[in-house]
């Protein structure tokens, strides 16, 4: 099938150029522009303490705007379900509810023989499927040096897997896949997996502060890899944290997206780039509190970006008068929290939580069996705890609770709905009708004329299209605008696909919207574990504040402008036929533009609720709009559209 598609696209190529990564390059220009603007702002902030504080507060406010809202705090309903003895410390097995029905499992490493409240820290787990696992070497080291550690299972890890069978066994190959699949539904509801991790971690810290053996004034947070991500997202919004360390995550988003592309779903909050929030900004919000960066020279997390980001941290802390409160260790290793990094971590936390710079006491390397360390009876909260809600159930409940709010919003009229829709699509308004039509080819066939064009709109990707004008066309002939996710060439390569249309005198217009057909991103740039053929471009688009669906809506409007302007097409009714990923973009375009007379869709998502109920689906991010389900679902647009929209399957 792949060979057929490639040859078909070559034969039916309309663009006068060929560059397989053109679409990603186009998107990355916005990433670079946003980063450059942010660089200008931070350099100005470095000129004075007041300017620095103003910059940090601005970052914090913009972060709050995009992270979404959090629920009211309710009873944690803490259960201490067991205790395991270690060498110089003990481990309590803990379960609490961060919100009703959401159970969080954790291990609390407590130093032995302490007579006064001890300092404590959260350890936020990396992406290992076992989460907190049977043990944590870093937590053992901390506890052996008089610092309590609460190691928290994130959503989708440890005893908190969501995509499981009836026995509690995982249905995906790892935590990064589960995180990515769950995040799509969260995004539609106006939140993210990162924000939900933040909430669970915030409630974990709330729990620590209920304990009389913990000193509430001496609290820290650290994490490695995915735990480093959680730490970065956490420390800027919780002033209770007095010291922190980020391991094997810290770099710059610009470098990461350019070198390896977007990471999994828990490592992105939509619109970060649009709001000019770089990874170092989340760390900078910790200032002037002590912060440690831990990196490896051979980590896949880019070291050059880490060094550039750390230089900004140094400048910030220097301007604020506390240069000693930020540090970075780079070791001759790769990814993760290895022994040398753990030693530095413990030393840093001892210094700032205990005012103690004596050598770090070596910890015994105790080994525990995973089965002995489980907090739940069956190894997973969702099959063990009465009343437990899966993330899917939580999100469906939220969606149903908002039903009346959506109806109230939709009743405000088309002008209000359209304004919000454009905002969600990342459009500042409907584009004007100024396009440039460039003819790129013409072939005469026995039954029709074939014309090739690229349609150019300032600031947008060109739209390649092929116009089939049958010899039987007349003034009343409809235009069939066909959008095929497999590419226009695949459709046109089989004469049988359009023979009947020629006989009936229908005008055919086939186009590749950006990211499909002629501008398809090479498959090797997207890891299959993300379950999305255009994951990198979809995530970059969300990062810069231009969801990929919104860009494709613009492409459809460009095609409608072409139909309104070209001498062969003026005055002919436009009927749109779309399949697959194109479906939701066409639904939005039909609501926005009355030049579409009818729509027929096949093999496409019919309601976003499908993504929330059954997140094990391909290509969700191609059709995610951040927070859209607060306002409408796809069936609402179909119901309110001025033209008939139907699904043919």
Where is each model-derived feature located?
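Cap/lid segment of the alpha/beta-hydrolase catalytic domain
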Residues: 115-210, 251-262, 268, 474-566, ...
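Alpha-helix capping and helix-loop boundary segments enriched in small/acidic/polar residues
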Residues: 129-137, 172-174, 188-196, 221-232, ...
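Alpha/beta-hydrolase-fold serine-hydrolase catalytic core, especially in secreted/extracellular enzymes
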Residues: 6-103, 287, 291-464, 468-480, ...
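Generic beta-strand/beta-sheet core signal
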Residues: 109-111, 152, 222-224, 229-232, ...
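Catalytic-domain carbohydrate-binding cleft regions of carbohydrate-active enzymes
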Residues: 222-225, 231-235, 240, 246-254, ...
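Primarily recognizes the serine-hydrolase "nucleophile elbow" in alpha/beta-hydrolase
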Residues: 145, 203-275, 559-631, 635-639
């Amino acid at each position: 099938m792949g060979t057929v598609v490639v040859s078909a696209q070559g034969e039916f190529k309309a663009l006068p150029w060929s560059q397989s990564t053109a679409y990603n390059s186009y998107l990355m220009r916005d990433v670079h522009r946003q980063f450059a603007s942010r660089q200008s702002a931070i350099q100005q902030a470095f000129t004075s303490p007041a300017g620095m504080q103003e910059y940090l507060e601005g970052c914090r406010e913009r972060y709050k705007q995009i992270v979404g809202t959090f629920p009211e705090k309710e009873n944690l309903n803490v259960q201490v379900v067991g205790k395991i003895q270690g060498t110089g410390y003990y481990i309590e097995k803990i379960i609490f509810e961060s919100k009703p029905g959401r159970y969080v499992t954790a291990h609390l490493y407590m130093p032995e023989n302490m007579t006064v409240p001890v300092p404590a820290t959260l350890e936020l787990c990396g992406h290992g499927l076992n989460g907190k696992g049977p043990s944590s070497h870093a937590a053992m080291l901390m506890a052996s040096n008089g610092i309590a550690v609460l190691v928290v299972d994130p959503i989708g890890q440890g005893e908190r897997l969501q995509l499981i069978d009836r026995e509690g066994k995982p249905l995906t190959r790892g935590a990064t896949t589960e995180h990515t699949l769950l995040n799509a539904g969260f995004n539609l509801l106006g939140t993210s997996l990162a924000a939900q991790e933040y909430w669970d971690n915030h409630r974990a810290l709330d729990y620590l502060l209920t304990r009389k053996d913990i000193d509430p004034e001496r609290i820290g947070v650290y994490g490695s890899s995915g735990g480093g991500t959680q730490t970065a997202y956490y420390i800027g919004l919780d002033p209770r944290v007095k010291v922190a360390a980020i391991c094997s995550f810290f770099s710059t988003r610009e470098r990461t997206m350019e070198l390896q592309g977007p990471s999994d779903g828990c490592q992105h909050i939509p619109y970060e780039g649009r709001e000019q929030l770089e990874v170092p900004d989340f760390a900078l919000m910790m200032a002037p509190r002590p912060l440690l960066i831990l990196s490896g020279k051979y980590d896949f997390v880019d070291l050059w970006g880490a060094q550039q980001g750390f230089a900004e941290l140094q400048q910030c802390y220097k301007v604020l008068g506390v240069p000693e409160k930020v540090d970075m260790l780079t070791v001759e290793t790769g990814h993760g929290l290895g022994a040398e990094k753990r030693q530095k971590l413990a030393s840093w936390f001892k210094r700032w939580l205990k005012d103690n710079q004596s050598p770090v006491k070596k910890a015994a390397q105790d080994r525990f069996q995973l089965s002995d360390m489980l907090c739940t009876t069956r190894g997973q909260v969702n099959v063990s705890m009465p009343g437990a809600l899966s993330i899917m159930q939580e999100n469906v409940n939220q969606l149903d609770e908002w039903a009346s709010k959506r109806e109230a919003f939709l009743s405000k009229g088309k002008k209000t709905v359209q304004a919000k829709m454009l905002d969600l699509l990342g459009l500042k308004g409907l584009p004007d009708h100024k396009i440039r039509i460039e003819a790129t080819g013409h072939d005469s066939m026995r039954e029709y004329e074939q014309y090739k064009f690229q349609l150019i709109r300032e600031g947008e990707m060109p739209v390649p299209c092929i116009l089939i004008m049958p010899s039987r066309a007349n003034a009343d002939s409809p235009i069939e605008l066909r959008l095929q996710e497999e590419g226009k060439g695949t459709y046109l390569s089989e004469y049988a696909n359009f023979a009947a249309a020629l006989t009936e005198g229908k005008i055919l217009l086939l186009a590749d919207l950006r990211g499909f057909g002629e501008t398809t991103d090479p498959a090797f740039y997207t890891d299959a574990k993300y379950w999305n053929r255009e994951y990198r471009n979809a995530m970059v688009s969300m990062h810069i504040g231009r969801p990929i669906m919104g860009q494709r809506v613009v492409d459809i409007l460009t095609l409608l402008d072409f139909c309104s302007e070209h001498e062969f097409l003026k005055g002919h009714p436009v009927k749109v036929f779309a399949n697959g990923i194109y479906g939701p973009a066409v639904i939005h375009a039909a609501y926005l533009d009355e030049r579409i007379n009818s729509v027929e869709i096949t093999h496409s998502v019919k309601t976003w609720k499908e993504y929330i109920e059954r997140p094990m689906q391909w290509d969700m991010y191609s059709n995610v709009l951040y927070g859209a389900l607060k306002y409408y679902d796809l069936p609402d647009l179909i119901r309110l559209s001025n033209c008939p929209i139907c699904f043919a399957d």
